[in-house]
Amino acid sequence: MLAVDGIMSENEENRNPLPSDEEAGPIRNAAAAPSKDGEEPSAGSGPPDPDPTGEQLLHLRGAIDEIDNRLLELINRRLELVVEVGRLKADAGRQVLDSARESAIFNRLIERNRGPLNERVLRHLFTQIMAASRQLQSPQRVTFLGPEATFTHLAAMNHFGQSVEYVPQPSIQDVFTEVEKGTCHYGVVPVENSIEGAVNHTLDLFFESELKICAERYQAISHDLLAKEGSLRDIRTVYSHPQAFAQCRKWLQKYLPGATLVESRSTAHAARKAAEEAGAAAVASSEAAHIYDLTVVASRIEDTARNTTRFLVIGRDEIHRTGEDKTSLMFVTSHIPGALYRVLQPIAESGLNMVKLESRPTKHQNWSYFFFVDVEGHIEDTAVADTVERMAGLSLYLKILGSYPKAGDR
């Protein structure tokens, strides 16, 4: 819109005609006439000098246009090469999404970047280019915990870009199911929040599913209070997801102590309810305000500014090592004293860095638990492979959930 507005204003200036002699009246005639004593008019009363700023702008804009033209040519040339890569992948039976390759590209570009382009914008630009590249190789369908404007939807778009087909699902279970059936190539699900901890439903589903973790993404979470009207006085009911309520508990108690809090299955569903009901509001993202035509009554109402959710991309792909990877495991131990310690001991002895440990009931036997572990490194690394092999020998059950590039934007 800014570029369009700029073009419109320049065109409007070009359409304004110069005043006629009659319109200029005595000003123009006085400038052209000699003085009474016969002297020529002074330089200050003649035609204005050319605008040096305008000439410089024209020169700079011309240079920018040339660069834009070259960028367009280079991007199209890149996409032509991508099509050739896609043909080779298809012939070899390889998947379109190559998280290791994309991670290596990002790392290389970030290392080469000398500014003024910042890393966040660089990632955004090349995310869109890579999304267009994947779409040319093979149209991609990505499913997520919906509806539109959930934080999972935002995380999916930030990871995959705009050039894929997004398919919302009403539950995390449905996301797993659609990928398992093959109707969608990948799914995006939340797995943990920096404030509220693990998303247990996601962890539980990995126990039964054969899907792999193909990538991870950290998404900053910021909550807004949305309503049809922009006044706190009129709000009697607030809808939101339980985790969003928990993350905004202090603000809601302070500013809406008398409001009824009603849990919804997602923040986006809460926004939809607020749009349909008088006197209702929702705790949701600013993106939801645009989609459901709501007003942002208050922004950034979360109790803690450093609120981040980790999302996982699930699919069937085995991701190759990048050198900056993470491996996720799940295992079940025997129900005897010291069993967990013995299974984890190989990690300590190998010098690997364990970055997550979580437990969940197996639901197949009372007081039986499975454990989730994340370690730095890739299963193709000798140290990781040897450690996992030792852990498997000490467990009743062990499964590798996937090795994938570590996300850089925490």
What are these regions (language model features)?
Residues 2-410:
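Domain-level signature for soluble enzymes in the chorismate/prephenate branch of the shikimate pathway
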